[in-house]
Amino acid sequence: LRALEVYRETGETISEHDRKSRETPDRYDALYIGLSFRDRQDLRDRIDRRVDVMVEQGLLDEVQALLGSGLPRDATALQAIGFKQFLAVADGTAAVADAVEEVKLRSRQYAKRQLTWLRRNPDIHWILWEKEPDFPQALQNATEFLTAAGVC
């Protein structure tokens, strides 16, 4: 759909449009700061805990409320990680425990894809966190980076 939209608006294929976009110089000199756990297992554990909290705070109720509001089952919102798996629970075609494990798996896979994509950018200043992030240290690290770049 996006490719068709680009073609209609520009008369270019999506690959041509993307190539030209990459060749165009950036308008601004951007600075990038990335946050990452030093140990990947800590990230996985945090994702798993976050999914557990989402379920405890009513993910299934939220899915049922969306369905009750008349949102079509094929709506984009219901295809998101978490909603898609719990839509099956709401339909009675999946068990809660299975849906929880699937949400955890899909979330970890998504996080891995995000980090893989971000790590291709050599301009990102990475702040590595331990199991329990040290926010004051991260702030100091970011401030030092920005100061050295002439921003602060």
Predicted regions and their residues:
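Phosphate/Mg2+-binding loops and adjacent switch elements
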Residues: 1-30
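Catalytic core of IPPT-family isopentenyl/dimethylallyl transferases
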Residues: 25-152
